[in-house]
């Protein structure tokens, strides 16, 4: 298994709940999670008020239903994303593949950057619509909720920008391949390869030599005499 990549511990290592809860990235996700509830919650509960001329409900932000829908979608999306990314952070050390870790970090980086931009757009849009809202009984009743939505939209910009920076830092850490190569070379340098074992029947460097003659061989047969002519 490949470990120690993208700012996480070695793959398969046990997760320390205390150190995980104290991580800046975890604290930022929890803060963003709370801010998202503080945005879409007031809009759902108090974001629609009675119009002065009739019983129909209108969005407190200048009667623009698109502003309320955008705020709810933005906050609800951030709420679900923070929940999913928190679970991903918990399981991140169990991911053994460096490629899968890289994809997870890229997903975090891309989504955090996108939501930072959307929070900025939402903050500007809601602020503009609130400034154009005409005063009235319904507006005065839901004024605190509208101001809370705008305030926590601004806080969400800061928290998501910080999450983007943390994801970028983790992506730049990448995989410490030099450390991985050093460990491999260190393990291979002290390893020796044994030769042929003694008594295995295989000779390494000895060459075959014919045994020396201990006596001169007589090629003529015994008992035979050459006849004389």
UniProtKB/Swiss-Prot annotation:
Modified residues (N-acetylmethionine): 1
Membrane topology value: Multi-pass membrane protein
One Pfam family it belongs to: MARVEL
Summary of the function given for this chain in its UniProt record: May play a role in regulated exocytosis. May indirectly regulate the activity of the plasma membrane dopamine transporter SLC6A3 and thereby regulate dopamine transport back from the synaptic cleft into the presynaptic terminal.
Record-linked PANTHER family: SYNAPTOGYRIN, SYNAPTOGYRIN-3
Name of the protein in question: Synaptogyrin-3
Assigned keywords, A-Z: Acetylation, Cytoplasmic vesicle, Membrane, Synapse, Transmembrane, Transmembrane helix
A GO BP entry: regulated exocytosis
TM spans (from-to): 30-50, 70-90, 105-125, 148-168
Source organism, top-level taxon: Eukaryota
Compartments (UniProt record): Cytoplasmic vesicle, Secretory vesicle, Synaptic vesicle membrane; Synapse
Assembly description: Interacts (via N-terminus) with SLC6A3 (via N-terminus). May interact with VMAT2.
Family as reported in the entry's similarity comment: Belongs to the synaptogyrin family.
GO CC term (a single one): synaptic vesicle membrane
Span of domain MARVEL: 20-172
């Amino acid at each position: 298994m490949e470990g120690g990549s993208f700012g996480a511990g070695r793959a398969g290592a046990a997760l320390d709940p205390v150190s995980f809860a104290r991580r800046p990235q975890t604290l930022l996700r929890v803060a963003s999670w709370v801010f998202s509830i503080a945005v879409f919650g007031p809009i759902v509960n108090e974001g629609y008020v009675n119009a002065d001329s009739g019983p129909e409900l209108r969005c407190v932000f200048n009667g623009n239903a698109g502003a309320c829908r955008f705020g709810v979608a933005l906050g609800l999306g951030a709420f679900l994303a923070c929940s999913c990314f928190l679970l991903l952070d918990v399981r991140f050390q169990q991911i053994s593949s460096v490629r899968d870790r890289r994809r997870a970090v890229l997903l975090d980086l891309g989504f955090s950057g996108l939501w930072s931009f959307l929070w900025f757009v939402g903050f500007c849009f809601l602020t503009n619509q609130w400034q154009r809202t005409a005063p009235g009984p319904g507006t005065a009743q839901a004024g605190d909720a509208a101001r809370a939505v705008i305030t926590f939209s601004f806080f969400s910009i800061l928290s998501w920008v910080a999450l983007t920076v943390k994801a970028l830092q983790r992506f730049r850490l990448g995989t410490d391949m030099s450390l991985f190569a050093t460990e491999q070379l260190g393990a291979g340098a002290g390893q020796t390869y044994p030769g042929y074992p003694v008594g295995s029947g295989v000779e390494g460097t000895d060459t075959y030599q014919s045994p020396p003659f201990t006596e001169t061989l007589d090629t003529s047969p015994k008992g035979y005499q050459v006849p004389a002519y």
